[in-house]
Curated annotation (Swiss-Prot):
Domain of life (superkingdom): Eukaryota
The gene coding this protein: act
Catalytic reaction list: ATP + H2O = ADP + phosphate + H(+)
Protein name (database record): Actin
Cross-referenced Gene3D superfamilies: 3.30.420.40, Actin, Chain A, domain 4 (3.90.640.10)
Short name of any one Pfam family annotated for the protein: Actin
Amino acid sequence: MEEEVAALVIDNGSGMCKAGFAGDDAPRAVFPSIDGRSRHHGIMIGMGQKDSYVGDEAQSKRGILTLRYPIEHGVVTNWDDMEKIWHHTFYNELRVAPEEHPVLLTEAPINPKSNREKMTQIMFETFNAPAFYVSIQAVLSLYASGRTTGIVLDSGDGVTTVVPIYEGFALPHAIRRVDMAGRDLTDYLMKILAERGYTFSTTAEREIVRDIKEKLCYVAHDFEQEIQTAAQSSSLEKSYELPDAQVITIGDRFRAPQALFHASVLGLESAGIDVTTFNSIMKCDVDVRKELYGNIVMSGGTTMFPQGISDRMQKEITASAPSSAMKVKIIAPPERKYSVWIGGSILASLTTFQQMWISKQEYDESGPSIVHHKCF
């Protein structure tokens, strides 16, 4: 492979798509993983109206569209929409011809095997990529943090995973996955706001609630204490201006993120992120636990709450750890929203990685199932 052809790195999240060129230190394009279909008939001729819109354009026209996310809980549920998002990524965002560049995609662990086979098939058959690779998101986050040992808590919009990695090897028996992440918190916040008399019902209005969550919500260090403070004073209240200039005030801004630690409020049986991380460490060999406790790496957009999430995590895991002498360290890099992409950029530009790609020739010989042999 010639040196000058940069590989394309695409981190297809359930909520946001991050795309760019290997070797760059940040993605060139970051846009919502959304396909929007018109709810109304266009009657004005010559306006260039389209049947469907993707990404930011869908977001800006959301008032007249039905928005769909083709990736749910890290698994692609609508391949036609997914193809549109990839087409948009290559031709509109990055402005490249996919047949000229190797493509690295990312995936959540413990995904159905058919998901990565179909990804492989589309990249080679629809987009004619010369080479392809799919990598586990949490492993890339660890690359980005410059470590080879650590336990990665990766929480995005659709799925939260905990992956322990020792000396560069993922420990598959201890991987934990919870299908609760940012989108569930957004839905929970919609419910909380509905109790206050603010109803958001359409797919477009849900995006407003997501914005409220990202701008106003935070993780309480002590949930019970915070509830008392919120009940007794208005010091925690913040206001938000809706697109129609109506202003709403929210006091208990810590309630929605609390679901990360107590999934039962969402009606889910799964444990919170703290307990899931602890359980994963306890599933690992006793000799490696100490290093995992000292290298808990956070990544993904749902770990980006402006205050409190790493302190709370530190407090909960220290309380669970078998001895008080155990040093618990939470690493929350400021760029963790994009650390999966950054890790992919590092990996795809390593000279030692170049023999790892699945080539078009190998695909033609073996078919989509080759992805299970070549990508771990």
